[in-house]
A protein has these predicted regions:
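HhH-family (HhH-GPD) DNA N-glycosylase catalytic core used in base-excision repair
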Residues: 1-453
Length: 453
């Protein structure tokens, strides 16, 4: 439940730490805003507070054109702690209902359509399809404000199959025609540049150094202020570069994709890789219950995501019982040998099919580890890999550490405790009393805090 007084103080002070944690509906104008909206604050008796943008929209409010709620970071708190609902929301945000049916989504979740509708009504007050349409319209609004894409391309990128359907849905959800948001003509560009926001603080220096120590040349790149890599999503391929802009509490992300139909899920994936939606104040309050009072907590620490669970699994196998530097060498050789070349002398991460078809003789490691890697790749080719990497321990050579690492970095699961990790063991030995159970459901962040020592 939202605390009205806390919300009032946050909106009057425009506290960026609350951005995306609630939204402000203004009764006199019929619009809803972020708590950081630069407009003159309305009177208390003209305000209603909502836990999410979708809740504000359901109540009949339209998004503000000045603070742009479509650009706000999300808060995982508003859809509760229900695991199935979390998965459903994540898949819908990645475009699961753009081209596929509700039945296909339910098959992926292992539940019936009626049960999924019930979950959405109970927790969100909206049907799954209505939620998906709301997300599509907000993403389209973000593209209209920030990109130079033609409106027809924006409709396609937002998951609409026709321009007419897009225009109708946009008018209903935003209250205006899409063309009215294009106030200033700009030269068109093949690339898409978006500002992706987070709630401060954000420990960019920690994340930057973590990624740099594991960066694979020609697949990834980075420097003091940016991180980028080549990516694939289904049949689409491209690359992105994210530049940290701390004064705006966000990243300026430039994307190049050969199929704009993949843009919505790719942007959602970039948000996950950079962990932009984490509520670090909430997380760190829980971690302090598990750690000694003198522990030097890294404020704003984020989960360093990988592009896919499969890539995370491959890197976990290649990192078994070796140093970070040695693991990086193994992954580099794999990418050089099997990664699909890109047009700019880069490489994509190797597909499961190419790894499964190779004898991997170029990898200097025990044969059992090569067999494990090929077994993982073959399972992916055969569609035998569970969506949750923690279930991969049935595969020969995949133990709890590898499965947990793949879940932590490949799906950004927030509650992975790698208690058997050597770095964690060393930290525990130095600290003495640590209570991992007290950090639930944020033990992934506890693991990373211990790695930071």
């Amino acid at each position: 439940m939202l605390d009205p007084e806390r919300c009032r103080v946050a909106r009057l002070s425009r506290d960026a730490r609350f951005d995306g944690r609630f939204f402000v509906g203004v009764v006199t104008t019929g619009i809803y805003c972020r708590p950081i909206c630069p407009s003159r604050p309305p009177r208390d008796d003209n305000v209603r507070y909502f836990p999410s943008a979708v809740a504000a929209a359901q109540a009949g409010f339209r998004p503000c054109l000045r603070c742009r709620p479509d650009s706000a970071p999300e808060s995982p708190a508003w859809h509760g702690n229900h695991t199935t609902l979390h998965r459903a929301v994540r898949l819908i945000n990645e475009g699961a209902l753009n081209q596929a049916s509700l039945g296909a989504l339910c098959d992926r979740l292992g539940i019936g359509e009626r049960y999924l509708r019930l979950l959405f009504q109970q927790h969100l007050g909206i049907s799954p399809k209505a939620y998906a349409l709301h997300r599509q319209c907000l993403f389209a609004k973000q593209l209209l404000h920030q990109s130079t894409l033609p409106i027809a391309d924006i409709a396609h990128a937002s998951g609409f199959t026709s321009l007419r359907r897009f225009n109708d849905a946009f008018r209903r959800h935003v209250g205006q025609a899409p063309r009215t948001l294009r106030r200033t003509p700009r030269a068109p560009s093949q690339d898409v540049t978006l500002m992706l926001a987070y709630r401060p603080p954000y420990a960019w220096e920690w994340l930057r150094d973590f990624l740099a120590a594991r960066r694979i040349d020609r697949l990834e790149w980075g420097d003091e202020h940016r991180y980028g890599r080549h990516i694939q999503w289904g049949s689409a391929s491209g690359h992105f570069t994210a530049v940290h802009v701390p004064e705006r509490h966000g990243f300026r992300v430039t994307l190049s994709l050969d199929d704009l139909g993949a843009l919505l899920p790719v942007v959602r994936h970039i948000r996950r890789v950079l962990d932009l939606d984490a509520d670090t104040a909430l997380i760190e309050a829980q971690l302090r219950r598990a750690l000694p009072a003198t522990f030097p907590l890294v404020e704003g620490l984020r989960l360093p995501g990988m592009w896919t669970p499969f890539e995370a699994g491959v890197r976990a196998v290649l990192g078994q019982q070796v140093s970070i530097s040695a693991a990086r060498g193994h992954v580099t050789r794999l990418v050089e040998a099997l990664g699909e070349p890109t047009g700019d002398d880069g490489r994509q991460f190797p597909t499961a099919a190419r790894i499964a078809a190779s004898d991997l003789a170029f990898l200097r490691m025990p044969q059992a580890r090569r067999d494990c890697l090929r077994g993982l790749a073959q399972a992916a080719c055969d569609r035998r890999l569970d969506d949750d990497p923690r279930q991969w321990t049935a595969l020969k050579g995949i133990g709890p550490w590898s499965a947990g690492y793949a879940a932590l970095r490949g799906t950004s699961h927030p509650d992975i405790w790698l208690g058997g990790d050597l770095g964690v063991k060393r930290a525990l030995s130095a600290l003495g009393t640590v209570e991992p159970a007290h950090a639930t459901p944020w033990r992934s962040y506890l693991t990373l805090q211990l790695w930071s020592l």
